[in-house]
């Protein structure tokens, strides 16, 4: 069993936070000009370098 170091845990949680969708209030505010963000990451397609 490997233990995650604190730095790696922080980087993984940052990557999880960055991987969320665009908030609905942003879509409303921009009149659906912004509906997705191009830096969305799929867990299967791309790997993290942490």
From Swiss-Prot:
Keyword Ribonucleoprotein (UniProt): yes
GO biological process entries: translation
The keyword Ribosomal protein is annotated on this UniProt entry: yes
A Pfam family hit: Ribosomal_L39
Keywords assigned by UniProt, alphabetized: Ribonucleoprotein, Ribosomal protein
Cellular component aspect of the GO annotation: ribonucleoprotein complex; ribosome
Gene Ontology molecular function: any one: structural constituent of ribosome
Similarity annotation: Belongs to the eukaryotic ribosomal protein eL39 family.
Protein's name in the database: Large ribosomal subunit protein eL39
Taxonomic source organism: Methanosphaerula palustris (strain ATCC BAA-1556 / DSM 19958 / E1-9c)
UniProt lineage: Archaea, Methanobacteriati, Methanobacteriota, Stenosarchaea group, Methanomicrobia
Protein encoded by which gene: rpl39e
